[in-house]
Amino acid sequence: MDLLIVLTYVALAWAVFKIFRIPVNQWTLATAALGGVFLVSGLILLMNYNHPYTFTAQKAVIAIPITPQVTGIVTEVTDKNNQLIQKGEVLFKLDPVRYQARVDRLQADLMTATHNIKTLRAQLTEAQANTTQVSAERDRLFKNYQRYLKGSQAAVNPFSERDIDDARQNFLAQDALVKGSVAEQAQIQSQLDSMVNGEQSQIVSLRAQLTEAKYNLEQTVIRAPSNGYVTQVLIRPGTYAAALPLRPVMVFIPEQKRQIVAQFRQNSLLRLKPGDDAEVVFNALPGQVFHGKLTSILPVVPGGSYQAQGVLQSLTVVPGTDGVLGTIELDPNDDIDALPDGIYAQVAVYSDHFSHVSVMRKVLLRMTSWMHYLYLDH
């Protein structure tokens, strides 16, 4: 484009010299040359500032690392590598034996606990009846002891000291039986009264454990979180998969919008507004230009973020060298859909300022696209 402008200016200058018969000497030639330098430089500077361009752009994709929620040996892996997978389809399975065994054991424990509750209720009824019986016997023995005691206070005592002592001991022994029966009844009642939301606490605990065990059993089948595809599937049956967030075993690429992430000079920030028109060219599609819209400007420069590390930190980058990130959403296009995710691109954004100069940027971008046909491999 620069050469085209220069040639156009040379042609116009030649025409002016011929039409107006301007004498050709060192002064007129110098004036024409300097005029061309200022004109071309001014146009290029206006274009660069008002219609930003960057060659640092990429068809961005968000990947989901797949990590199992439970640990086990892989028994089955999907064969849909690099193919569209619907949400909920199986990605891989883990050996479920020990998780199924825990579910079975907890179900048995829950059934036993439920039966034990019925047994406790029966024992409580029996303890209440026993308490009533031994209490009645205690009352009878107490009256008998009182009778012996009153008789011993009469002028003529009809009872011997041994009879009185036996009556007293019988009463005390029966009273101890009553206290033991009441304690047993209270213990059973305490076990039955340990309630959570109207249900016996042991039953609630076992139900919660069973729910967790069933969840873990379900997690032995790892499914697609959404529509998308998996690539570079390296796990095989027999692989040990651990529930560690730092050790994903598969990468899932969900379906998402055609989005380009571009890094612009910080000088261009005032001319980058969401909603501006944008054009994108790809190295893989020479000669083609794709239209889109600038949708957002990231509110932070990546190199300016810091994390607490317990030590003093300096700047991570030289200020001004790290670019501003913007996202461009492309119009629907089958050629773009066929491109691999992550492929590189070049982007131009057209602002409302000096819109007539945008023609230069558009021509330059198309020339860049055609230049992608030219490369050498050695």
Curated annotation (Swiss-Prot):
It comes from Escherichia coli (strain K12). It is found in: Cell inner membrane. It is a multi-pass membrane protein. Belongs to the membrane fusion protein (MFP) (TC 8.A.1) family. Keywords: Cell inner membrane, Cell membrane, Membrane, Transmembrane, Transmembrane helix. Coiled coil: none annotated. Disulfide bonds: none annotated. Residues 1-3, 48-54, 254-280, 331-378 are periplasmic. SUPFAM superfamilies: HlyD-like secretion proteins (SSF111369). InterPro entries: CusB-like_dom_1 (IPR043602), CusB_D23 (IPR032317), MFP (IPR050739). The chain crosses the membrane at residues 4-24, 27-47, 55-75, 233-253, 281-301, 310-330. Residues 25-26, 76-232, 302-309 are cytoplasmic. GO terms for biological process: DNA damage response; transmembrane transport. This is Inner membrane protein YibH. One of its GO terms (cellular component) is plasma membrane.
